[in-house]
Amino acid sequence: MKPQFPSAPRRRVMILAGILALVFVSASLLARPFRPVEPIPAGIVDMHCHIAGLGAGGSGCFVSPRLRDNWRFKVYLRSFGVSEQEMLQQGDALVGDRISESLAQSKLVSRAVLLALDGVVDADGNLDTNRTEVFVPNEFVAAMAERHTNLLFGASVNPYRRDALARLEWAKARGAVLVKWIPPIMDIDPSDPRLVPFYKKMAELSLPLLSHTGEEKSFSRATEALGDPEKLRLPLGLGVTVVAAHTAAAEKYHGERGPDRLARLMREFPNLYADISALTQFNRRGSLKEALTRPEFSGRLVYGTDYPLINTLMVSPWYSFHLSLRQKFSIWRTQNPWDRDVMMKHDLGVPTETFARSAKMFGGTNVSAVRREIHADERSK
């Protein structure tokens, strides 16, 4: 019987697949971390954990119709581990409960800073719901942090609000450990001189600023120029501790790479840090290596995940040639998202001090004491 051979097109596909498999296996066998691997410390705090809601249960949250019609919406629901129907039936607090439950099952991460997200503000200093894609009020996140001991309150205040300074003071009194901005979607220009009083109040209250820098593709619209790290020069000069989220990766400003602009600021300001959240995402390949090996970033990196995006296909050990096959399988088999994230970043060379820095910067707040004061005030009313 005459043997049957694959057709020419099929042979080409098989040869190409074989070559790719050989390259993949060879790269995995030769895999090396970006820097020497160090021990994983205890009590890690994730300083960059998002939450969202639909307004169910009186949370005050909302997602714009435009974003709800976008493909990203369903991805985010799945990554939070909830369905729209569940949220409508049980309330938005379900999302916070699920986050806390998953975090409690982590062997490596003990707490997370849960982030509120203010919206766009109009010319009168009020929330502009027509231009806001996602809104997560401080009251909702503060309540989640009071409800779950493994969640810390990350506030968000648009500095253009009429009562912005009072909102800062309220957040601090409720135990906020930082203020979160995403300037490209909140229409905030961090270099605006009108924000000087706001920055001075932040410095007075010892509230650090966690501000998005670099590419922003998580929403249906964004003004990328507002993510330029150079715009953070004003708050830095006024003594505000600033954490540049994502190391300004994957974006250019005025023809210059974001990380290059951030590195220049690092040399000038000792109160500037950068978090490593999202640096293992597919669209930021190579960014973690630069962060770990660039001398300007040494001693300035802070651990964060950008949860829930670590629960999406954007993050996978299979994208990296710097992990061995054994490491890839070990990470891939790990069920808890925080443990997966720590394991992958650890195996890629994230040092002990980076994992530990979040707890030193944000985990020292006596949250229990703050909660006791809040409950005592409520009882006295």
Residue locations for each model-derived region?
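H/E-rich (His + Asp/Glu) clusters that bind or coordinate divalent metals
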Residues: 3, 30-33, 241, 248-381
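N-terminal Sec-pathway targeting helices
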Residues: 4-22
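Hydrophobic faces of well-ordered beta-strands that scaffold small-molecule active sites
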Residues: 45-49, 112-114, 152-155, 179-181, ...
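Active-site gating/metal-coordination segments in enzymes
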Residues: 116-224, 288
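Short, flexible/disordered intra-domain loops and linkers
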Residues: 61-63, 80-89, 121-133, 218-226, ...
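Catalytic metal-binding/acid-base residues of hydrolase active sites
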Residues: 48-52, 158, 184-185, 214-216, ...
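An N-terminally biased module of ancient metal coordination in phosphate/nucleic-acid-related enzymes
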Residues: 25-115, 121-132, 359-362, 369, ...
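Alpha-helical scaffolding within the catalytic cores
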Residues: 94-101, 137-139, 164, 226-232, ...
